[in-house]
Amino acid sequence: MKEPLKVACVQAAPVFLDLDATVDKTITLMEQAAAAGAGLIAFPETWIPGYPWFLWLDAPAWNMPLVQRYHQQSLVLDSVQARRISDAARHLGLYVVLGYSERNKASLYIGQWIIDDHGETVGVRRKLKATHVERTMFGEGDGASLRTFETPVGVLGALCCWEHLQPLSKYAMYAQNEQIHVAAWPSFSLYRNATSALGPEVNTAASRVYAAEGQCFVLAPCAIVSPEMIEMLCDSDAKRSLLQAGGGHARIFGPDGSDLATPLGEHEEGLLYATLDPAALTLAKVAADPAGHYSRPDVTRLMFNPNPTPCVVDLPDLPISSESIELLRPDIALEV
């Protein structure tokens, strides 16, 4: 990161379970950010087509109609809707870090898509481990999803939600000299009276600690639960007590953990703005670089596999002979 960068951090409600309408809103927010002079905009977790709150409200059998609709409204990267977003990024000259539900063949993944100011894909990642009931609908990422990307605006990285409570995953990111991190959150509207672990105090603190631990800028976009979503999902008083409207707590933190933008009210839609000064990175790293001069690899080290792990690996074409079988299966020897 060589030059100051103005960034925008989204706090808004998607058009729930409506892919095309949420793409429209995505582009509108991108246009607002670009008009304000921002060079990068960050969106919440599963912004498209919205976070599947219904998974937390009832039994899997009750959710099946909504699960089917969620599949249909999730984003395919090679699609007209995705091209609309990348074309808008190119037209506006804007970097975009988009949280979305990725539909790949018959599976869904909690994804983040990084697009550069030319509309080209910088990187695509998937949440390594879906959280709790999310695992009834979403698949998993692999080590290739724990990486940073060197760009003209800085070294970019991203994680989703409770990935920020995974110390080893965070350390893998810190070790790659991450400079601008997007910590994407869905909203802090769930189980408010039952547990602090899902609330804004704990999870906003996780984003702030990430900034201080990694000495990087952290953009923490956060969605809002709209009254329309409550009307759609909560058909009883019990469900309305579990999921409440609001929950927006978007933040931007400096590499020393300081607030760089004034938060919005939890029901308020808008964009948070801040100008990131690269000099702040140097000052923070001088004090503590946990994967550099402040580390003790002779005492503790992280084992990290950054390679993709596809379900099917094509073997090379080999002539059918005893030698080729021995090459593929050294435990088998055939007599000819």
Curated annotation (Swiss-Prot):
InterPro entries: C-N_Hydrolase, C-N_Hydrolase_sf, Nitrilase/CN_hydratase_CS, Nitrilases_CHs. GO terms for biological process: detoxification of nitrogen compound. Keywords: Hydrolase. Residues 5-278 form the CN hydrolase domain. GO terms for molecular function: indole-3-acetonitrile nitrilase activity; nitrile hydratase activity. Disruption phenotype: Cells lacking this gene are unable to grow in medium in which the sole nitrogen source is either indole-3-acetonitrile (IAN) or phenylpropionitrile (PPN). Their growth is also moderately reduced in medium with ammonia as the nitrogen source; one possible explanation for this phenotype is that the disruption of Psyr_0007 results in the accumulation of endogenous nitriles that can no longer be degraded and which inhibit bacterial growth. It catalyses: a nitrile + 2 H2O = a carboxylate + NH4(+); (indol-3-yl)acetonitrile + 2 H2O = (indol-3-yl)acetate + NH4(+); phenylpropanonitrile + 2 H2O = 3-phenylpropanoate + NH4(+). The active site is at 45 (proton acceptor), 127 (proton donor), 161 (nucleophile). Its EC number is 3.5.5.1. PANTHER family: CN HYDROLASE DOMAIN-CONTAINING PROTEIN, NITRILASE. Arylacetonitrilase which is capable of hydrolyzing indole-3-acetonitrile (IAN) to the plant hormone indole-3-acetate (IAA), and allows the plant pathogenic bacterium to use IAN as a sole nitrogen source. Is also able to hydrolyze phenylpropionitrile (PPN), allowing the use of this compound as a sole nitrogen source. This enzyme may represent an additional mechanism for IAA biosynthesis or may be used to degrade and assimilate aldoximes and nitriles produced during host plant secondary metabolism. Belongs to the carbon-nitrogen hydrolase superfamily. Nitrilase family. This is Nitrilase. It comes from Pseudomonas syringae pv. syringae (strain B728a).
